[in-house]
């Protein structure tokens, strides 16, 4: 029976790996022939979106960086409070439950919520800042929970040694705990960025579809995911769709590999 179960587990692992390899191979085979410098740094032209995707790359980087700047301070401060200052009880458990529930909200729901709140109610319009605020809500629970776990993983004896030398609570947190947990915190941030880059529904409802180079946070734009969705959905230029998919996949895989590198480096 042990050999049978071992075979079942091994088959499940192989199937998972083969599915991933098949997806990557399919995208690479169809997308690689269309990748060039003109495609990466050019502008879409005409109704068939011929040319390149440079404005969509800029929009993706812009909105993701803005979302990270909004999310990270809030998530880290909340995690520090939960791990170091808050008394464990029902309130803290409620906050953790709310964070976990927020992480499970479908992106389409978050997109509609972002449109209703940021675009309409707050009057920010279809813009980078509207999309960044909505993406920050998706990133927040990932960074917060990862940071809290990273802080709790710092050995207690390090804190006790600092207290024994006369350090204050804030000095221990800022000078010892957070630097010790930095690797895992950075891993959580990188994973959250990877998820934000791959989101479509949220940015579709909050940023719009305009093909331009955004300068102000109030400018609209078209990220790579929305560009890919429009190309594939309308079937107007599947070559550009496969090329965009390949670049997007490479970016997300690079962030995931970087997160694994940070995690292993700090062990």
Predicted segments, located by residue:
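Transmembrane alpha-helical segments of polytopic membrane transport and secretion proteins
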Residues: 1-15, 259-267
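Periplasmic/extracellular loop-to-transmembrane helix junction in inner-membrane transport proteins
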Residues: 1-11, 27-67, 230-239
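Transmembrane alpha-helices
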Residues: 68, 146, 169-205
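C-terminal transmembrane helix and the adjacent membrane-cytosol boundary/short C-terminal tail
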Residues: 148, 152, 156, 163, ...
């Amino acid at each position: 029976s042990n050999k049978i179960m071992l075979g079942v587990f091994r088959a499940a692992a192989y199937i998972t790996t083969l599915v991933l390899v098949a997806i990557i191979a399919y995208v690479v085979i169809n997308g690689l022939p269309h990748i060039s410098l003109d495609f990466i740094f050019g502008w879409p032209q005409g109704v068939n979106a011929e040319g390149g995707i440079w404005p969509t790359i800029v929009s993706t980087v812009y909105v993701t960086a803005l979302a990270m700047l909004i999310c990270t301070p809030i998530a880290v401060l909340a995690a520090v409070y939960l791990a170091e200052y808050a008394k464990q009880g029902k309130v803290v458990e409620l906050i953790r439950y709310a964070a976990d529930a927020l992480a499970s909200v479908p992106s389409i729901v978050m997109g509609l919520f972002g449109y209703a709140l940021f675009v309409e109610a707050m009057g920010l319009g279809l813009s980078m800042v509207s999309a960044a605020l909505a993406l920050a809500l998706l990133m927040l629970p990932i960074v917060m929970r990862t940071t809290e776990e990273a802080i709790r993983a710092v050995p207690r004896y390090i804190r006790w040694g600092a207290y024994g030398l006369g350090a204050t609570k804030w000095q221990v947190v800022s000078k010892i705990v957070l630097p010790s947990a930095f690797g895992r915190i950075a891993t959580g941030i990188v994973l959250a960025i990877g998820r934000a880059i791959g989101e479509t529904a949220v940015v579709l409802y909050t940023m719009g579809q305009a093909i331009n180079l955004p300068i102000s946070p109030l400018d609209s734009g078209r990220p790579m995911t929305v560009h890919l969705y429009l190309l594939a959905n309308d079937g107007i230029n599947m070559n550009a769709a496969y090329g965009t998919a390949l670049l997007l996949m490479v970016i997300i895989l690079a962030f995931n590999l970087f997160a694994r590198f940070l995690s292993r480096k700090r062990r």
